[in-house]
Amino acid sequence: MAPAPASVMQTLVTGGSGFIGQHLVALLAQDHRVRILDLRTPACAPEGVQYVKGSVLDPATVREALNDVEQVYHLAALPGMWIPRKSDFHEVNCLGTQVMIDAARKRGVSRFLHCSTESILFGASSSEPVVSERVSTTLDEMPGAYTRSKMLAEQSALEAAATGFPVVIANPTMPIGPHHGNLTPPNLMLQHFLVRRVQFYLDFTMNLVDVRDVAAGLVLAMQRGQFGHRYVLGGEDISLRQLLEVMGTISGREALRVPIPGGIAQMAAVIMEFFADRVTHWPPEATVEAVQIALRSKPLSIEKSRRELGYAPRPIEAALREAIASIPPCAQRR
């Protein structure tokens, strides 16, 4: 790889081919030399962006990708809540983070941003009406393999910060927007409900955010965030019932909406996950872990990100319209 010019900062984005990653890369490419480390080839990277094909679990590939790099955005992770081999969550999300931190420390990078998730902020015993980055949750409170792996990854970042490693942590909420085929859990949820004439739903509070605001927030956290601190990158709190109504208005599609209690949702998720694990080997429509997170969910505060970073997310309606427009017409005709 040719070294970056001395006047231009070389930046590595792991997971740069993903939903958030592609928007972050597009933003960074305006004034950085950007390199992507990902197993997937980027679908729409700006001209001049370098691509290294590989896994964050491969130390040799990671060292190659870190050549001449000054800043690292670590986004690479398995984002869904169901995969055939559950141990992959721990390997990619937790061990992959450790590999990246160890290699970046040896490289001597100036700053490292670890992209975590809001899902680990919802504890089983929390009595706070609003959740913020100050919340303290434990590994035992995590409802499944995904959240456990993400909590362990964040703990690795915090432990590294405690020993002087220049790492900042960002906790995005549920990003939506134009996805170009990157069907992340929030976008899959929108598609799931949009195509159904009868919508059975567990009502809960979620926080939706424009994916472009997440990208901008990651850059702000890298530039202005305090080492060893968390920053929640969210947008608007909205109930699923309200979201379904807004989606119906935007899409012009009528649907019968049927709320279901938490106990029924949990039983349905157990059955769906059993068949996914044992029979279909295909992601179920609901998982036990996702239902548990929904039942614990509360409004999220982004005041620290506003105050310390200058983070200013836009209203979510435009992103919601774009996300709906990105759903293939063949799916919407179901």
What are these regions (language model features)?
Residues 152, 183-185, 202-222, 229:
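Substrate-positioning beta->alpha
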Residues 163-169, 173-207:
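NAD(P)-dependent short-chain dehydrogenase/reductase
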Residues 217-284, 302, 318-334:
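Mid/C-terminal beta-alpha module of Rossmann-like enzyme folds, strongest
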